Amino acid sequence: MRGTDDQLTTGDGRTLAYRRVGSGPTLVCHPGGPGLPGAELADLAGLDDSLELLILEPRGTGRSTRPADPAAYDFEHYVADLEELRVHLGQQRIDLLGFSHGGMVAMAYAAAHPERVGRLLLVATLAHRDEGLDAEMERGLAEREGEPWYPEARAALDEEEAAEFADDEALAENLARQWPLYFGRYGEREAAFVQTLAGLVPNADALRRFNSDVWPSFDLRPQLARIAAPTLVLAGDRDFVAPPAAARAIAGAVADAELVVVPGAGHFIFVEAPEAFRGAVLSFFGVGARA
């Protein structure tokens, strides 16, 4: 991925790395996972033509220091890292995009530091888990049962949720089998994107910690009323991970929120519907696309 690599040293001596891509108003981007280093965001459907994307490599991913204690992969620490990044950048407020798990971190940060967020973009994420959303997820998966890749992909998903991966390399192999599930339609464009993720090295400790200790009782809803920033919530209507019902719950709880549901898109909205994604974000920013 093109761009300029940079990093900061945190108060406790860790490296926190990031990459700058494009030019224009700065948009801090927190990747998903947890445990993905940001390569999956690429240029976010060409947003780098109009914005400077500052793509964080979250703790334990990419060039950022890996914590010795897996307990450090929690929202409190992820939020603290974002605040250290803001201070390092010398900005009173940051515009913040969170994708998937990064959206959870972004909501937690915007609730903890409401005065520090100018605009908040939440992409393919959710703020809670309950039986209703679990049922929505299962319905979304059931819609894909006729696809030729489904049996292997679903088996990989079940293995991942049960933490049946020994290390980073095993998780990378698991995710390679899962990826088709994450698209509303798995065609040539989506397969080409998945090929770009072939060298991606995820952090197994971070995902294992989330699946075992965070996800079972995950609920950020009590914090959402504290978010003061204008907020754009983007969802794909075929996203089994973060279904539209999850996006509607967020938009209904944040005081100044706009909801956009993209027809036909799955989890990677910016890959499957780049024009719709780019248009929604630039409109929210009040920035026109460059010729």
Located regions from the model:
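Active-site loop/oxyanion-hole signature of alpha/beta-hydrolase fold enzymes
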Residues: 58-101, 279
